[in-house]
């Protein structure tokens, strides 16, 4: 596995998704990562700390420069809990849960997040403005409504399928909406 190539492609994908999602300082970006899928294995079966480290470090460097928070989703064994900075958990009044990820419960990405974040904690729920899914991990439960699929510049990272989501406020009305006749305001 060419880790330098994984890092370079991660950077390319993240910058593209951030541009398309139009995130701003203070927003939250969720990452779902199957390092198993990146290395060509089946999700949850071939976790790689080294791959997790390269991807997390690359993403953190980009997001920290922009003032955007990272939330790293864990696997189903941790009920898809997320690693975030304690400062974010405090700011958003997120409930912290007591668990430490392992390579096979949380995964390589969560382990790397615990290594590279300043004060990492696990939270059970979050509402992010956008996110990146590397390896079909299903991040939708953590992205606010209304979710908008983004087609990243690259469709794969290593052997993993890559998708992304942005979000927008709900449109209540507008050009496509239909209304019943307003008999009170008619005329």
Curated annotation (Swiss-Prot):
Family annotation (Gene3D superfamilies): Hypothetical protein TT1679
InterPro entries: Antibiotic_NAT-like (IPR028345), DUF436 (IPR006340)
UniProt similarity note: Belongs to the UPF0340 family.
Name of the protein in its database record: UPF0340 protein SSA_1999
Originating species: Streptococcus sanguinis (strain SK36)
